Amino acid sequence: LISTEDRYLLDTNVVSETRKRRPDLRVGVFLEALRADQMFVSVMTLGELRKGAETRARNDREAAEELSRWLERMKEAFAARVIPVDGEVADRWGRLSATRTRPVIDTLLAATAIVHDLTLVTRNTRDVADTGARLLNPWEQ
């Protein structure tokens, strides 16, 4: 388990912000202050990004291919810092999900952050605020 201080699990909305033509300055400042070894992503984030590329391919093949190339570079950059959904994360997700209905992926990310002692960096804090996960919303910094 990852248990070092100052380590962050980046939600899809944070990672995606870096691709925008005009990313939010607060998100950029937050990410630029971190070292690479402080940033982690879940396999679920990679899945959401792949879904985005495949969905875009229906309307804009060129943009989808560019997004796919970016995703491959990101996967290489994060290679040792991609966290799977393992048995312990799944168990924590089940416990969190039993307390009330929550978005599945957001709750899996909260469970991952709890199990690996990471701070979940997300814009979607409302749905997981009562999970016990440490949360940080860079849009509110």
Protein language model regions, located:
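Short, well-ordered coil/turn elements that cap or connect secondary structure elements
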Residues: 34-36, 77, 115, 130
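Active-site neighborhoods of divalent-metal-dependent phosphate/nucleic-acid chemistry enzymes
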Residues: 2-6, 51-56, 65-68, 76-123
